[in-house]
Each structure stands twice: as structure tokens, then as C-alpha cells.
Amino acid sequence: MKSNKIIFLSILICSFDQLTKLIAITTTPARYTPILPGLIRLNLVKNKGAAFSILSSFPFLLSIISLTVALVLILWIYSRSSFNYYNALGIGFLLGGTLGNGLDRWRLGYVVDFIQLIPVNFPIFNFADISINIALIFLLLDILSKKRI
């Protein structure tokens, strides 16, 4: 996959993340809004930390880390002529998720989290978080597809 396609994928993911956050902010009048009753609800949270709210006392540091990761990924994307399928998808999803949460950090000083799984005690998250986890799956598939048995 070519560099421009990876960047385009990242922009789509980041845009979708920002759109879902905007929709959640503007359409959630109460603290909790059921999406799928008993399974998923909207619960707006201003998360100043990273995953599981770690480093919440250092939002500026997290902003710098987001910016650095995004810049390194962009430089890496443009330093290569092409990527294999899983690697390209992994990098695209990672950059898109990093930019989505990074934009929140840079603009707002926190990340907008809003998806809550009701049956399990799991941190509230957003589409950028989902994208980063999907990226890890694609990157793992890339590694496993190169292994010879």
C-alpha cells in the first residue's frame, strides 16, 4: 500500500473519531444515555490521562507524546515507498487514533471519552481508542504473517 493511502485512511479515522465525539457532546443531555440498553451507553468524560487515566497529572506531557508519535509515524510513512497490507492498515489506524486523541489534547487539554460498556467494569473510551487497538491487531497479524512455521 502506498503512503498516500495510509495518510488518507488516517484522516478518515481521525475525522470519524472527531465527528463521533462532536455528536456525543451535542446530543447527550443527561449523564447517561443508553445506546443499546444493558450493553452500551454514552457517558461523557473529560479524560486528562492516557489509557486507564494514567498520567492524568501530566496532560501537557501527553500532548507532547501524541504530537511526537504522530510526527514519527508520518515521517516513517513517507520514508518508505510501500507497505504490506496488514502493516499499512496497522499504521493507518494507529496514526488516525493518535491524531484523534491528540487533537482533543491540543484543543481541549483532555480527551473526550464517551463509550461505556455496561456489563463489564472497563474504562470509558472513544473511537480513537478503538482504532489504536485495531492497529495493534493488524500489526500483530503483520508479524505473524511473516513467521515461518
Where are these regions (language model features)?
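Alpha-helical transmembrane bundles and membrane-interface segments of multipass inner-membrane proteins
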Residues: 1-149
